[in-house]
């Protein structure tokens, strides 16, 4: 404990000083931290401070510095006024539900408010921070580079689980917390064992969501970076993220990983990329499953059953039950995992059984009015995204709008079953991407395009000319006697 304080306090002070000197640094540091924050919180158990590290080290200091010293930068944000008004209405409903008689634990209610609202302002900060194409490229480079660690760790955990043993591998990584981060070593039989993999996170949903999200981010990166080496790295990371998403242990990624890529490729409408992924995507997926020892036909059969069963047995019944039983809501925190963890047995007994779907959760905590405003926000963001993409003509910019729009669409569909929008790290990245989306129409990629052209010209100049090129060159050069 003393050693942790001896190291942690100076580190926290250094982070806060860096944010104080330039608030944008806080966003970059936050992006580097989120792939490891929840995993670090696991090692800090039973100390509850671990789950708040991200907020107290980065999010709250960024907000404080921005509001107190840099509010003039708020004028740079490009979030449309109708969406901002919806945010205000949603925040009012969330705060109002704090006074719901169903909220018996004030701390649990505060956690519920934090989960619903804390990260939405990141959309404004991202929109105010990304003023040039170079700013976006810097953010994408950091995100792609740091993603190598959790993706490789996740694949290593799957490989070791298949060879050394699942419990042995997870215990090696997480010690006494191994059972907690793997849902008591849960696995599925699909010709071979299909393991729940947490990687550097605290459970599989976070890691699977991260791998899924990185498909959109690496697609953007490979489309806009002027450096050929970075573009190649981003392409490799796209494939790595796809494989990691498939082997994360989340069966829903058998559907959502290919679906996200298909939506992005369809929106981007680059025929060469579409052809490559339509040809190689199924091959990569089949090879990944076979290499892992999984039966392709068993996976397809179970995935089909999973989709139909989730709809008929879980998603629709949860929505209907929530609408019928809790039209006015039970109060914030009543269906939030972090809030329920600190409640007493008596408090939990008075609450409904928790549901997985984001929309059903909204009904339970915020009632029908909360669900309506939430759907208005998500639907409006999606409509704006499609509109921005439709009017964007510049190829680099269009690839970015395609990736973000595709991600927004998939998250909206995913939210019928899961809570990804409120889980690390998507609770941060969803709003960052929304902010970037609304900034994109004003970004100019002229310098990036010119830098790429110059790099390609230099590359061609260094290449040894072919025999035909040398012959043609000799014919063009006049000879004097």
PLM features per residue range, with description:
Residues 12-14, 91, 95-99, 140-168, ...:
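Alpha-helical transmembrane segments of multi-pass inner-membrane proteins
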Residues 17-27, 67-85, 219-236, 270-275, ...:
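Membrane-interface helix-loop-helix junctions at transmembrane boundaries of multi-pass membrane enzymes
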Residues 20-45, 55-120, 411:
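N-terminal hydrophobic segments of proteins, predominantly signal-anchor/transmembrane helices
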Residues 36-37, 45, 292-366, 385-392:
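Long extracytoplasmic/lumenal interhelical loops at the membrane interface
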Residues 65, 216, 261, 273, ...:
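Transmembrane alpha-helices of multi-pass inner-membrane enzymes
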Residues 152, 156-164, 243-248, 265-307, ...:
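A membrane-periplasm/extracellular boundary helix in multi-pass inner-membrane enzymes
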Residues 195-205, 349-385:
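A conserved mid-to-late transmembrane alpha helix and its immediate loop/hinge
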Residues 241, 258, 262, 366-412:
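Hydrophobic transmembrane alpha-helices and their immediate junctions
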């Amino acid at each position: 404990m003393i050693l942790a304080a001896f190291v942690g306090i100076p580190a926290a002070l250094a982070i806060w000083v860096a944010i104080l000197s330039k608030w944008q640094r806080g966003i970059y540091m936050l992006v580097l931290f989120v792939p490891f924050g929840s995993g670090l919180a696991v090692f800090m158990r039973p100390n509850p401070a671990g789950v708040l590290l991200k907020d107290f080290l980065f999010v709250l200091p960024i907000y404080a510095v921005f509001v107190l010293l840099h509010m003039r930068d708020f004028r740079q944000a490009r979030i449309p006024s109708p969406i901002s008004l919806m945010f205000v209405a949603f925040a009012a409903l969330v705060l109002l539900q704090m006074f719901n008689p169903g909220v018996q634990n004030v701390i649990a209610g505060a956690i519920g408010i934090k989960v619903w609202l804390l990260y939405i302002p990141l959309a404004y900060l991202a929109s105010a921070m990304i003023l040039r194409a170079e700013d976006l490229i810097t953010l994408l480079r950091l995100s792609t580079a740091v993603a190598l660690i959790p993706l490789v760790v996740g694949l290593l955990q799957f490989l070791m689980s298949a060879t050394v043993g699942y419990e042995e591998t997870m215990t090696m990584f997480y010690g006494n917390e191994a059972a907690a981060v793997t849902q008591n070593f849960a696995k599925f039989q699909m010709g071979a064992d299909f393991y729940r993999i947490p990687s550097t996170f605290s459970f599989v949903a976070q890691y699977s969501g991260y791998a899924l999200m990185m498909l959109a981010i690496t697609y953007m990166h490979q489309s806009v970076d002027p450096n050929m080496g970075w573009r190649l790295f981003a392409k490799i990371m796209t494939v790595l993220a796809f494989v990691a998403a498939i082997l994360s242990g989340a069966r829903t990624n058998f559907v959502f990983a290919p679906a996200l890529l298909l939506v992005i490729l369809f929106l981007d409408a680059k025929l060469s990329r579409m052809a490559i992924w339509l040809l190689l995507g199924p091959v990569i997926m089949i090879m990944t499953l076979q290499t892992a020892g999984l039966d392709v036909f068993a996976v397809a059969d179970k995935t089909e059953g999973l989709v139909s069963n989730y709809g008929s047995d879980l998603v629709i019944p949860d929505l209907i039950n929530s609408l019928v039983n809790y039209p006015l809501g039970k109060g914030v925190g009543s269906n939030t995992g972090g809030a329920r963890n600190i409640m007493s047995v008596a408090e939990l007994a008075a609450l409904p059984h928790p549901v997985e779907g984001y929309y059903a959760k909204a009904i339970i905590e915020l009632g029908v009015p909360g669900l309506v405003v939430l759907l208005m926000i998500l639907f409006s963001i999606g409509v704006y995204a499609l509109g921005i993409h439709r009017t964007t003509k510049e190829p680099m910019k269009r690839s970015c709008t395609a990736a973000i729009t595709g991600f927004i669409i998939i998250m909206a569909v995913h939210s019928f079953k899961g809570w990804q929008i409120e889980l690390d790290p998507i609770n941060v990245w969803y709003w960052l991407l929304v902010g970037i989306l609304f900034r994109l129409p004003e970004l100019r990629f002229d310098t990036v395009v010119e830098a790429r052209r110059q790099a390609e010209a230099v590359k061609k100049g260094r290449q040894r000319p072919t025999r035909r090129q040398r012959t043609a060159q000799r014919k063009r050069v006049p000879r004097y006697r």
